[in-house]
């Protein structure tokens, strides 16, 4: 009591304390970063290695495997996957959440160094690594276009000047430049001319390499001067290479231009990028795992004018895609929802108390509690994101509850004629323990969330802490500022003030009287109510089992990502045409604002597209509806598929898949994997629960298989190394020399001119110079035949792997899809040598599914322990927790009604309901126990009186919580997919709970009281407990 009096009788100190809390909150708010969601990115590092011309199988066995064995020893690696394609290998390392990305990078570099001696000697460069997840959608895409400069020149500007500068910006993890390659001098050989001159491809390669060297020449020096020696030992352009003498034939010089076409071109001609309908170079910017997306984007935008000034005016630098506008719009929507919730909650207080003065008190208490929370958020390193702001929105109903309970009880004493300061002190003393019980038991709900590990735990931690801090500050405010304001501001109601809103007052009195009559009947028919309570428990179990489930609500971020998968034998020219066709279909859609895409590189039959949709206010369809509409149009394109998916703020795993969810097949028997993967993929493609089923296993690429006759080769004086070198020189885009420039290094690339490689007859024109100097055609010692070969070889860990990706059709949930896949695998009878498991987001969903029930039980157990400690009773906590089944039924039924799957957001709603609905029971039980102790009432009389006396605050707190959550249900615009499931769950649970717990709680109270008396050896002490 002295604690309350300290603040009630010292108003200046109390006001200044509240002002201090508010000012700290304002400062914290101004310094908080902005993000779509809490920081939940796994630390991911990508290792890249190249060996131009090497087959996928060669890359897997000679490059990927040695690196994997070394990288697999690094501590904290949770998943390691690799993909080897023509001439390149990429290994993705995903680390545990608590692994520092910089420390992991040092370990990765050490592992690469340790494996260096096991790698092929012909690799043009050492393996490199990047601290970025290639499967993440870029946070920003810049494009370079020009009517004057070539694609190679644009790529040079992008990779030499722009990308390094952008990479240095805080938060940027990787800048991937696509759409072309660096400038190069290309030597296109004429096989017939070479044969006529008696010049081998190795002769050409050696001559070019020897003619373009960069070696130190030293200096001349005398007693007084020093002269640096400089020679014309380097060739820079195609014009300088053209007259190069490579051979003498019968005394005549054979120049490079006589046997080849030499051009200034690009290093790899099999690359193409586009923005809308125009060729473009793309700079795809990804952030570091720990970076804030908004801060990173703002930093990049601030540097754009400087970047534009470093490139010629004829080059147009544009932002093709930016993830930040929809994030900002989503957060603005949440902020508006928060403001509406505060206004509605204050309106509820005004309607019940019918006093402007009384309404001012919670109108002050609520902002102080919410604003003060920002200071704690800043100190904890949190951000302003959808979840933390939703926590504050929901907290509106909670923080006003404490003020309402105190205010309503003080107002009741004032109506009885007590003086304001005395009423404030007496009223606060009576409900102080109640408010403490309500707040502590509510915070206890979130303790299991704070201890939860993995991605769900990291995702929900900010929500739980933010809400807990708001409740803690609210508890302090309701026991200090609220009673002080009541004591100094409230007065006895005047008659004319009592008439104000008399219609609502009469309705409330009528409701209370009706409730009293119905409660008397219920207390005389307790068995029926008990049966209803048991029925709700059973209904909870059935609804939870049957309701569709997913990991996280499908977001509409305004950005789509598409993966193109074409026939495995398609040429680059045909693939570029497919890219243009797909881009035209998408560009013509009325909901699309911008589209960029690229194809080429080591995977000729694949490509990527990034689509920016118009803002939500300018389109009527959701991202998923747009995908459904485009899917029908895209299906008409023969020879290729474009798989679209909406970019999400949460994406788990490092696989660059063509769909949102993955199912991975593993086997130590590669033949078994290649046999069963097509069967499983075809079966899954028939399931109605899955859409866009595709696989990264591509085993049917066209291959020309050459078979050497080793006996003939030995007789003719030819070895296998010379024959393989011939093929690499002719068809491998072999980099044979380096051109050094001040800003970069460029390559001289040699191959047979594409005009002479249009069909299989190109092999017949190839020849080798043997050890006697004779030209021996390839057909003399080799035969060839067409065959199939893999376009890529994939590993997970050290096992062969194949990943099947899929999206969800409209109306289907991830639980539907996972159950269907499990059934399909059982029906197919897949052998034990082939193991299947979900990967990425689908894997996290499976893990979360297994822990959801345990989490809910843990929350209930924690609340029980806290209540048991507060009440010093085993029984009364059970009475209070009996309110939960009805809330669960209401929440699950509401989700079913709105066709919303049970997700992580809905789980948060269930956890909140555990804390919310027990408040009603706490108020009833507290007053009933008080009446039994001091009023000498029977248990039935005590609980009946408690229900009637607490009817008004119960209605107020419930409606405050309901109206605080209602804007979440009704909100639209950006980010509503996250807000609505939370609002639906809470509103549904509150409505059902309010209808039932007003009757079930008194019945359960009496039941346990009788049970306690029956088993108690000291009934009298039990009554006065």
Swiss-Prot record:
GO molecular function: xenobiotic transmembrane transporter activity
Key word Cell inner membrane present: yes
Pfam annotation, one family: ACR_tran
InterPro entries: AcrB_DN_DC_subdom, Acrflvin-R, Multidrug-R_MdtC
GO cellular component, one term: plasma membrane
Oligomer and partners: Part of a tripartite efflux system composed of MdtA, MdtB and MdtC. MdtC forms a heteromultimer with MdtB.
Protein name stated in the entry: Multidrug resistance protein MdtC
Organism of derivation: Escherichia coli O6:K15:H31 (strain 536 / UPEC)
């Amino acid at each position: 009591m002295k604690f309350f009096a300290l603040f009630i009788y010292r108003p200046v100190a109390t006001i200044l304390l509240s002002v201090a809390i508010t000012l700290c909150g304002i400062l914290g708010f101004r310094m908080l970063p902005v993000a779509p969601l809490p920081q939940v990115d796994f630390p991911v590092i990508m290792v890249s290695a190249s060996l131009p011309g090497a087959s996928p199988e060669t890359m897997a066995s000679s490059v990927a495997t040695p690196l994997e064995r070394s990288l697999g020893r690094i501590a904290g690696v949770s998943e390691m996957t690799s993909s080897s394609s023509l001439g390149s290998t990429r290994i993705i390392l995903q680390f545990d959440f608590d692994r520092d990305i910089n420390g992991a990078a040092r370990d990765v570099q050490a592992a690469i160094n340790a494996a260096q001696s096991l790698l092929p000697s012909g690799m043009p460069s050492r393996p490199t690594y990047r601290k970025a997840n290639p499967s993440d959608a870029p946070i920003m895409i810049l494009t370079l276009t020009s009517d004057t400069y070539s694609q190679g020149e644009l790529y040079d500007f992008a990779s030499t000047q722009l990308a390094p500068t952008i990479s240095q910006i805080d938060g940027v993890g990787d800048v991937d430049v696509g759409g072309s390659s660096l400038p190069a001098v290309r030597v296109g050989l004429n096989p017939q001319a070479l044969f006529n001159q008696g010049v081998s491809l190795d002769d050409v390669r050696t001559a070019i390499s020897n003619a373009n060297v960069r070696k130190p020449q030293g200096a001349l020096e005398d007693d007084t001067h020093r002269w640096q020696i400089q020679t014309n030992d380097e060739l820079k352009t195609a014009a300088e290479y053209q007259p190069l003498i490579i051979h003498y034939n019968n005394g005549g010089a054979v120049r490079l231009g006589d046997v080849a076409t030499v051009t200034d071109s690009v290093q790899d001609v099999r690359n193409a990028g586009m923005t809308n309908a125009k060729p473009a170079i793309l700079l795809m910017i990804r952030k570091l795992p720990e970076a804030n997306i908004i801060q990173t984007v703002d930093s990049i935008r601030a540097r754009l004018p400087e970047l534009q000034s470093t490139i010629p005016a004829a080059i147009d630098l544009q932002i093709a895609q930016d993830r930040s506008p929809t994030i900002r719009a989503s957060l603005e929507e949440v902020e508006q929802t928060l403001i509406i919730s505060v206004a509605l909650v204050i309106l509820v207080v005004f309607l019940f108390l019918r006093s402007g003065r009384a309404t001012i008190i919670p109108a002050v208490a609520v902002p102080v509690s919410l604003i003060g929370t920002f200071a704690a958020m800043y100190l904890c390193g949190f951000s302003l994101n959808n979840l933390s702001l939703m926590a504050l929105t929901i907290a509106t109903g909670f923080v006003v509850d404490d003020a309402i309970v105190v205010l309503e009880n003080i107002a009741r004493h004032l109506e009885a004629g007590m003086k304001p300061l005395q009423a404030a002190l007496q009223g606060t003393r009576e409900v102080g323990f109640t408010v403490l019980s309500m707040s502590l038991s509510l915070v206890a709900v979130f303790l299991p969330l704070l201890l939860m590990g993995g991605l769900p735990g990291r995702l929900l931690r900010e929500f739980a802490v933010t809400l807990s801090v708001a409740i803690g500050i609210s508890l302090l405010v309701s026991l200090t500022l609220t009673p002080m304001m009541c004591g100094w501001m409230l007065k006895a109601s005047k008659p004319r003030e009592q008439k104000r809103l008399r219609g609502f007052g009469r309705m409330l009195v009528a409701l209370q009287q009706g409730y009293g009559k119905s409660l008397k009947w219920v207390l005389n028919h307790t068995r029926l109510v008990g049966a209803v309570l048991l029925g709700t428990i059973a209904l909870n179990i059935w609804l939870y089992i049957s309701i569709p489930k997913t990991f996280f609500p499908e977001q509409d971020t305004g950005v789509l990502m598409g993966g193109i998968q074409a026939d495995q034998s398609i040429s680059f020219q045909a693939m570029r045409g497919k890219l243009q066709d797909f881009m035209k279909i998408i560009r013509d859609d009325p909901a699309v604002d911008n589209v960029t895409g690229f194809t080429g590189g080591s995977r000729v039959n694949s490509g990527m597209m990034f689509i920016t949709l118009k803002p939500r206010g300018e389109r009527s369809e959701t991202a998923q509806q747009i995908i459904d509409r485009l899917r029908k149009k895209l299906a008409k394109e023969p020879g290729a598929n474009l798989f679209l998916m909406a970019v999400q703020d949460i994406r788990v795993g490092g696989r660059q898949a063509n769909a949102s969810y993955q199912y991975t097949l593993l086997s130590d028997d590669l033949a078994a994997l290649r046999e069963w993967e097509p069967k499983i993929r075809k079966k899954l493609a028939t399931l109605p629960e899955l859409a866009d089923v595709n696989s990264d296993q591509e085993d049917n690429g066209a291959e020309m298989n050459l078979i050497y006759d080793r006996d003939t080769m030995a007789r003719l004086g030819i070895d296998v190394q010379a024959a393989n070198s011939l093929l690499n020189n002719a068809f491998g885009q072999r980099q044979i020399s380096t051109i050094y420039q001040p800003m970069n290094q460029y390559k001289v690339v040699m191959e047979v001119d594409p005009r002479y490689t249009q069909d299989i007859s190109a092999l017949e024109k190839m020849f080798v110079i043997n050890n006697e100097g004779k030209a021996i055609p390839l057909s003399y010692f080799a035969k060839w035949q067409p065959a199939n070969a893999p376009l890529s070889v994939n590993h997970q860990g050290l096992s062969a792997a194949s990943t099947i990706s899929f999206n969800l059709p409209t109306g289907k949930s991830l639980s539907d899809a996972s159950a269907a896949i499990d059934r399909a695998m059982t029906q197919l009878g897949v052998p034990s040598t082939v193991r299947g498991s979900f990967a990425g987001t689908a894997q996290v969903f499976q893990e979360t599914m297994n822990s959801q029930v345990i989490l809910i039980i843990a929350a209930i157990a924690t609340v029980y322990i806290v209540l048991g400690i507060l009440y010093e009773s085993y029984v009364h906590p059970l009475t209070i927790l009996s309110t939960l089944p009805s809330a669960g039924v209401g929440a699950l039924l509401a989700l079913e009604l709105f066709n919303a799957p049970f997700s992580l957001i809905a789980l948060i709603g269930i956890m909140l309901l555990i804390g919310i609905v027990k408040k009603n029971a706490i108020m009833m039980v507290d007053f009933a126990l008080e009446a039994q102790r001091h009023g000498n009432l029977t248990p039935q009389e005590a609980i009946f009186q408690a229900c009637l006396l607490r009817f008004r605050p119960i209605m107020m707190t419930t409606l405050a919580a309901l109206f605080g959550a209602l804007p979440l249900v009704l909100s639209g615009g950006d980010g509503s997919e996250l807000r609505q499931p939370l609002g639906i769950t809470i509103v549904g649970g509150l409505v059902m709970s309010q209808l039932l717990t007003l009757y079930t709680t008194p019945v359960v109270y009496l039941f346990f009281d009788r049970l306690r008396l029956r088993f108690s050896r000291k009934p009298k002490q039990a009554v006065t407990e």
